[in-house]
Amino acid sequence: MSNYLKTRYSEDKRPHTSYPAELVNYLFQRFNLKPSMKLLEPGVGRGEFLREFKKLGLEVVGLDISPEAKDLSPDLHIVIEDSDSIKLPFDDNSFDVIYSKSFIEHLHNPSFFLNEAYRIIKPQGLLITLTPDWEVQYKKFYDDYTHITPFTSVSLEEIQKACGFKDVKVFKFRQLPLLWKYPFLNLLSILISPFVPLRTTNKYLRWSWELMLVSSGVVPKKK
């Protein structure tokens, strides 16, 4: 895994764009998040999403297995730990929100992580997870050699319920901000998607057919 983050998130491969700010603002409104909430992002990468949550007034902490994450985000509080198999270095009921994007599919043991997430989220706190939709992306899911555990909408819902989360909801999601404002345009994406090359490098064409799963789960009052 040496240099994985610096290679995966190089400016050549993934130049900085306005997308993190657009997605974070969408999620902030969609899930009724509030400034001053304490948020943890596992799989923080280069910190671009976490940084946007911080701009909105949340108290943020990042978590990553790679020490490179600290080098990529010296302005953020980043904790280095293997969240796949080791108890997370946080007290019970520490966070209002745990948010992750393109993280849970990298885990050998997602149930272990979700049980830990349940432990450290406060009662009535929220888990927000974004992960590729296996039913749509199975042909190229393993193009990223670090992908391990795929999810469907059913399995993503069931694993969270099994780990104690309540009011679990999962919906399919295209990563095109225009579609969030004008959902009727999803029909156009559906119509053109069969004609988009599987491994197109044009992100707008790619995102017209790639679907993500977005899930949310609430931690109930604990005994």
Each language-model region and where it sits:
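Short, glycine-/aromatic-enriched active-site segment of Class I SAM-dependent methyltransferases
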Residues: 128-149
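A short His-aromatic
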Residues: 102-106
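Conserved N-terminal segment of class I S-adenosyl-L-methionine
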Residues: 1-91, 97-101, 111-114, 173, ...
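A C-terminal cap/extension of S-adenosyl-L-methionine-dependent methyltransferases
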Residues: 128, 158, 169-223
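Short alpha-helix
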Residues: 148-163
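A short glycine-rich, Lys/Arg-flanked "PGG" loop and its adjoining helix->strand segment in the class I
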Residues: 111-123
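A short hydrophobic/small-residue beta-strand
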Residues: 60, 127-128
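Short N-terminal helix/helix-N-cap motif within the alpha/beta-hydrolase-1
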Residues: 107-112, 139
